[in-house]
């Protein structure tokens, strides 16, 4: 069989396609991942063709049976991919024609690859997007469970990567719980853009058949029909919105991983990862490297790049379909797979790590973490104006630094030299690490009472996710 005969669009051409055309034009090496969606869409399309009298009942039965066989062949690796057939859509149609002859050639009636492909991608996003949503919910549940067990663990909270104030470890974990809730809602919003029927738009102007697009919408379980054939086949907004959601999620993932990398380092040391989630060095025997966190941090850049790739590609395209759009799937597939494995990796690290309270306490003391509490003590108890209190405590910290001491072991005479109020039990309570967190009584704060309150709200948030997958 000649190259010309193998091309399903070859009637207009007399010359065989060049090698470079086939090599640069093939996409089956990556778009084979759409085979399930392509077969799902083709079955729905065939049923619609039967509804409008293009196919008989017997022909529909043959097509459905053969498409099911092709799906099995693809899953078992029995269908050979050929560059001359370009993409997964042509492979499936070509194989269908091999199996049932002329009947198979009827399937593409009232359909273009333009509307076929964009519909496949929409179905793919809906399916994989829901799996990502499940993974986000699973990660949020892991954060919630660890937060429940970490309420009584006091760790440093950091600003500018310097010790700032004591917080309960649960407050830290819940901060990411709520960030991921926003990611969850972003994905729910983004998936709505794919919940639309583009199939039936043809190449771009519609088709010369009285197709039943409402029937197709119901067959594919979609909520709406694209009202304009040109927009339906050419828009990639559904991919953009999905990649925006992936990007925001991966930015959060990267920052979580940055925390894990820092907090597990010898310089911080407030958490430990088990050996099973770390690696060693080929030359330095002492090393224990947080490779999962580092790799996810690196992968976040790829997902950001995928979004940028699509943005730049789309901004210069004229209306409707252009072959450039073939490249959108590379960005999409890579982002989906990267997000999925990153969520799994972060969940395992969160469930695995253990806090190191003694290192946390040392960092808090050496970092003067209760300096703000001491200033507030002067304001509340001694009626000192806050700016004056701020200056007095700042002076006290400077004295501690000069003497290489902390707020806890600076001799009382040196404290009194700064302020007469820096004495006795009142002073000790003001700088106490164990009391500091419970002084943060504002809503959303890190006191134990507010943490218990926040955990209840978090649990309610998780319960609401049960309806996402009904």
UniProtKB/Swiss-Prot annotation:
GO cellular component: cytosol
UniProt-listed PROSITE patterns: FUMARATE_LYASES
GO biological process: arginine biosynthetic process via ornithine; L-arginine biosynthetic process
Pathway field: Amino-acid biosynthesis; L-arginine biosynthesis; L-arginine from L-ornithine and carbamoyl phosphate: step 3/3
Catalytic activities: 2-(N(omega)-L-arginino)succinate = fumarate + L-arginine
Leading EC class: lyase
Main localization of the protein described in the UniProt heading: cytoplasm
Protein family per UniProt: Belongs to the lyase 1 family. Argininosuccinate lyase subfamily.
Keyword tags: Amino-acid biosynthesis, Arginine biosynthesis, Cytoplasm, Lyase
Enzyme Commission code: 4.3.2.1
Annotated protein name in UniProt: Argininosuccinate lyase
GO molecular function: argininosuccinate lyase activity
Localization annotation: Cytoplasm
CDD domains, per the entry: Argininosuccinate_lyase
